[in-house]
Structure formats: C-alpha cells, structure tokens
C-alpha cells in the first residue's frame, strides 16, 4: 500500500512538533528566587524547586535552585538536612514561585 506524500509529510512534521514540546521548567539558582524558562531533557518528568536556608540565620533569603528532574526527589534520598525544602510539579513552567 502506498501512502500519499502529503500524508507522510504530515506525520513527519507532527513528530518534529512533538519533539519540541517537551516539559519546560525554570532552570536557575539565586537568593530569594529566580526565573529562567528552559526546555527540559526528555528524561525529565518534573519541575523542581529546592530552597536551602542557612542553619545559622533563618532571616536570610534562601538559596533557591530550580531545575528539571526525572521523578520527584525527597530530602532524605538526596542526603540533605532539615534546612532544605523541595517542591515538585509536572506542568510547564510550574516551578515559578
């Protein structure tokens, strides 16, 4: 069975479009927060925010890291202490705040 050229072209173009529509997250690091939208690798399923506060002074702004991640890590699996909080989400640019 021969498929028409226009049909094959439509399939190829739709595959290309799907490749460019992966998860997008903010990827950045800064005190108090940051914002830089970026496309994630295909292995990433979550956008993550990690906030780290100084154990000496809780009045300082936290160091905030935003990134793509495959899965949702928890503090204990990363070996991080009680001064770290992690939030995960699964939609585009959901790790804004």
UniProtKB/Swiss-Prot annotation:
Pfam families (UniProt xref): UPAR_LY6
One term of GO molecular function: acetylcholine receptor regulator activity
Secretion signal, residue range per the UniProt entry: 1-22
A biological-process GO annotation: regulation of neurotransmitter receptor activity
Record domain UPAR/Ly6: where: 24-72
Keyword Disulfide bond attached: yes
Tissue: Widely expressed, including in dendritic cells, macrophages, B- and T-lymphocytes.
PANTHER family reported in the protein's UniProt record: SECRETED LY-6_UPAR DOMAIN-CONTAINING PROTEIN 2, UPAR/LY6 DOMAIN-CONTAINING PROTEIN
Oligomer and partners: Interacts with CHRNA3, CHRNA4, CHRNA5, CHRNA7, CHRNB2 and CHRNB4. Interacts with CHRM1 and CHRM3 probably in an allosteric manner.
Protein name as annotated: Secreted Ly-6/uPAR domain-containing protein 2
Record organism: Mus musculus (Mouse)
Gene: Slurp2
């Amino acid at each position: 069975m021969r498929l028409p050229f226009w049909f094959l072209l439509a399939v190829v173009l739709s595959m290309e479009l799907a490749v460019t529509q992966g998860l997008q997250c903010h990827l950045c690091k800064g005190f108090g927060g940051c914002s830089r939208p970026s496309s994630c690798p295909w292995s990433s399923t979550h956008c993550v925010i990690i906030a780290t506060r100084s154990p000496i002074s809780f009045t300082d702004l936290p160091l905030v890291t935003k990134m793509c991640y495959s899965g949702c890590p928890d503090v204990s699996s990363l070996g991080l202490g009680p001064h770290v909080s992690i939030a995960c989400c699964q939609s585009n640019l959901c790790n804004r705040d």
